[in-house]
Amino acid sequence: MRLILLGAPGAGKGTQANFIKEKFGIPQISTGDMLRAAVKAGSPLGVEAKGYMDAGKLVPDALIIGLVKERLKDADCANGYLFDGFPRTIAQADAMKDAGVAIDYVLEIDVPFSEIVERMSGRRTHPASGRTYHVKFNPPKVEGKDDVTGEPLIQRDDDKEETVKKRLEVYEAQTKPLITYYGDWAQRGEENGLKAPQYRKISGLGTVDEIRERAFDALK
């Protein structure tokens, strides 16, 4: 099972990724984790990546693809792998294809933007413990107060409505085109000796368990 998980920020990809990797016994490949591990290990690619990171620059796609190919040689990837948050752009998807990185499925978790804004902007956090609430879906017993300590809850900057909307704008411009990219490739079939992935789309609305069952059904 070699899989790319697509969906907007707040669509529930992280939650479903955990279910999928447990069911299929595959690792979740995070480019952020990979970069940190390569830098820590001092590998040639890690040293090169560190130069860009220290200069505050984006690590080039070609370098990230090199790290991906290195990571996929590890023993835990023998049965497959799950990409969450990569590729983010058409250029990265093209680079993956050119490098011959095989993908069996692309699974899109579809949630309307209005729902995502409500989900994320309604979150409230107790800073000391990390306990999280939601003003609509999981409210505290006393409005604005932590259930355990009674201390005030905060809204993280990341969860503020204007921030959520900006993140969705970036997704719309950069990552959403991947939906068309992989959907079209699935219809065209094999290219340059690389088998086209199957494209699956599920609704991200409903309970966590309902969405999990949809995801598992889509990957049969």
UniProtKB/Swiss-Prot annotation:
Record's keyword annotation contains Nucleotide-binding: yes
Chain residue ranges for the region called LID: 122-159
Subunit (UniProt): Monomer.
Any Gene Ontology biological process: AMP salvage
Keyword tags: ATP-binding, Cytoplasm, Kinase, Nucleotide biosynthesis, Nucleotide-binding, Transferase
CDD domains membership: ADK
Coiled-coil intervals: none
One Pfam family, short name: ADK_lid
Domain notes: Consists of three domains, a large central CORE domain and two small peripheral domains, NMPbind and LID, which undergo movements during catalysis. The LID domain closes over the site of phosphoryl transfer upon ATP binding. Assembling and dissambling the active center during each catalytic cycle provides an effective means to prevent ATP hydrolysis.
Metabolic or biological pathway, per its Swiss-Prot or TrEMBL entry: Purine metabolism; AMP biosynthesis via salvage pathway; AMP from ADP: step 1/1
Region NMP: start-end pairs: 30-59
Protein's job: Catalyzes the reversible transfer of the terminal phosphate group between ATP and AMP. Plays an important role in cellular energy homeostasis and in adenine nucleotide metabolism.
Name of the protein this chain belongs to: Adenylate kinase
EC number assigned by the record: 2.7.4.3
Keyword Transferase found: yes
Chief location: cytoplasm
